[in-house]
Regions:
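Short, surface-exposed amphipathic charged segments that create phosphate/polyanion-binding patches used
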Residues: 35-44, 103-106, 184-189
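Surface-exposed acidic, glycine/proline-enriched linker/cap segments
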Residues: 97-112
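Short beta-strand/loop segment that forms part of the nucleotide-sugar
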Residues: 1-2
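A glycosyltransferase accessory/donor-loop signature
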Residues: 126-274
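Short, surface-exposed beta-edge/turn micro-motifs
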Residues: 86, 118-120, 156, 195-196
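A short acidic, often aromatic-flanked loop/helix-cap motif at beta-alpha or helix-coil junctions
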Residues: 29-35, 96-97, 175-179
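Active-site-proximal specificity loops/subdomain of glycosyltransferases
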Residues: 6-54
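GT-A fold catalytic core of metal-dependent nucleotide-sugar glycosyltransferases
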Residues: 24-30, 44-99, 116-117, 123-124
Length: 274
């Protein structure tokens, strides 16, 4: 819902660099601001509703991706995919069957036991989405205090409740989730492979943060950044207490002790002020 002069300059340069056309759609999000939000998720999580409705009768399908997803493979199979008549969207599940069963019980929708999906990747059948009135029904549910009490991931939970049994499930390579804070563990399993098409950098630490850009898993983002007009743009520094805390942890993990302890000191100062 914002597009400044600097944004225009960079996107103009990107379009010229790759000899393509980029369309920017500005959304008026005022009506969405009253819906449930958290410190991590603003009203922008509901823009996917507007996107799906806007492209009805303009495009038969729309690929929605969260902004913390990077592409490292071909999307041709998605471009060529044809939906069956009653399927609303293609999604990728997260978690295992026991997690799906828990979410089905918590949200009161039995069909979720067949698969609970992450809403960061949605290939949307715009005709069926509109026929099912998904956006209007989702907003109505998010305005119901009884439903809001049950949900933990506002847009995602409601979409799972509405779309159970109306989905087709894609391979995990189209939404491979990875938290850069896994790097703080002694050991972890990296789910990203050479076959991964979309890496989804979940969690508060992102590859554009200056404390996390140098991990191997961040290099897909860095390669894209370096091949774009943003190549000389500085990475983001920690600005709030949460970011300072994670920055400190990552710096200490990488044995950059001065930066690590310095950010811990700034973190404690910020916490004392609030």
């Amino acid at each position: 819902d914002y597009f400044g002069d600097d944004d225009r300059k960079y996107f103009d340069a990107l379009a010229r660099q790759y000899k393509t056309r980029i369309k920017i759609y500005l959304i008026n999000g005022d009506r969405l601001r009253s819906l449930p939000c958290t410190k991590n998720w603003t009203h922008a999580i509901y823009f996917r509703f507007v996107i799906a409705d806007y492209f009805f009768n303009k495009a038969p399908k729309v690929l929605y991706l969260d902004a913390d997803i990077i592409c490292q493979g071909t999307i041709e199979p998605l471009i060529n995919y044809t939906f069956s008549e009653h399927t609303v969207a293609m999604v990728v599940t997260e978690g295992q069957k026991d997690w799906w069963a828990k979410r089905a019980h918590s949200l009161g929708v039995a069909g979720i036991a067949n698969g609970y999906f992450n809403s960061g990747f949605l290939l949307i059948n715009t005709n069926q989405w509109t026929n099912e009135r998904v956006s209007a029904r989702a907003i109505a549910m998010l305005s119901d205090p009884e439903i809001v009490k049950k949900i933990t991931h506002p847009d995602q939970d409601v979409l799972n409740m509405l779309l159970a049994d109306k989905l087709v499930y894609a391979d995990i390579k189209y939404n491979t989730q990875f938290s850069l804070n896994y790097q703080l563990k002694e050991s972890f399993k990296n789910p990203v492979t050479n076959d991964t098409v979309f890496i989804h950098y979940i969690g508060p630490t992102k590859p554009w943060h200056d404390w996390a850009w140098d991990y191997p898993i961040s290099q897909a983002f860095m390669a894209a950044k370096n091949a774009s007009p943003w190549k000389d743009t500085a990475l983001l520094k920690p600005v709030n207490s949460n970011q300072l805390r994670y920055s400190a942890k990552h710096m200490l993990k990488k044995k950059q002790y001065i930066k690590g302890f310095g950010n811990y000191l700034l973190y404690f100062i910020k916490k004392l002020k609030h």
